[in-house]
Regions:
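Conserved G1/Walker A P-loop phosphate-binding module
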Residues: 1-139
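Conserved C-terminal guanine-recognition region of P-loop GTPase G domains, centered on the G4
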Residues: 101-138, 145-214
Length: 214
């Protein structure tokens, strides 16, 4: 057993032996990461649609693993991790897998799980960390309520587990911010220390005045 696994196992024992009884006695909730064995570091990608999240992932992994397009291309979360071959697993399969700490996602309901996917591919980068791609924010007036599952709760779940949150924003579409602002101020509350905002496509502006005029 590696040194990392030994330390992780010992930390989990301390949580179960000391912190969990204390949490129950004092009626406070342990963070998600304290309840489950730590795995690979993971990065969560958020942002409005067509902001470049999936394109960035494809560039990083040097393969077209995620669909891209000007219009919204997906309505679910996708976990990307290392595997010996390219494969895709559905939400029900991965939440019942004993080696994956995703059982807590069951409470988000079948509509969420039906849109959840895990993709494996033989990328050397994914031996060191996992990626979580999210559907683009729906910023049209009233459109955010058309999702058939609790998107904000899904964001919170993955954000709590994430070691880094990359929030892509397209400055060429400054009006598309309704759900984006809501996610920034609610599900990500208290997790700002993990957050990095990326102004993607900003190089398309000729100067700062052109950027400001949008």
């Amino acid at each position: 057993m590696s040194v990392e696994r030994v330390i992780s196992k010992k930390a989990i024992e301390i949580y179960d032996r000391d912190l969990r009884p204390l949490a129950e006695k004092l009626a406070f909730e342990l963070p998600v990461r304290a309840k489950e064995p730590p795995g690979l570091p993971n990065v969560l990608f958020l942002g409005n649609h067509s902001s470049g999240k999936s394109s960035f992932i494809n560039h990083l992994l040097e393969t077209d693993v995620q669909k891209t397009g000007l219009a919204p291309t997906d309505d679910g979360f996708t976990i990307l991790c290392h595997g010996d071959q390219k494969d895709t697993f559905d939400g029900q399969t991965i939440t019942s897998h004993p080696s994956l700490p995703l059982k807590n996602l069951n409470h988000l309901g079948p509509a969420f799980l039906s849109r959840l996917k895990l993709k494996t591919l033989p990328s050397p980068l994914l031996k060191s960390f996992a990626l979580v791609d999210s559907p683009g924010m729906i910023d049209a007036t009233g459109a955010a309520n058309t999702r058939e599952y609790d998107f904000a709760s899904g964001v919170r779940f993955f954000a709590e587990k994430a070691d880094l949150i990359l929030f892509f924003f397209d400055p060429d579409k400054p009006g598309t911010t309704a759900q984006t602002i809501s996610i920034l101020t609610q599900p990500l509350a208290g997790l700002e220390y993990k957050l990095r905002i990326i102004l993607n496509k900003v190089d398309l502006f000729q100067n700062i005045m052109a950027f400001a005029s949008t």
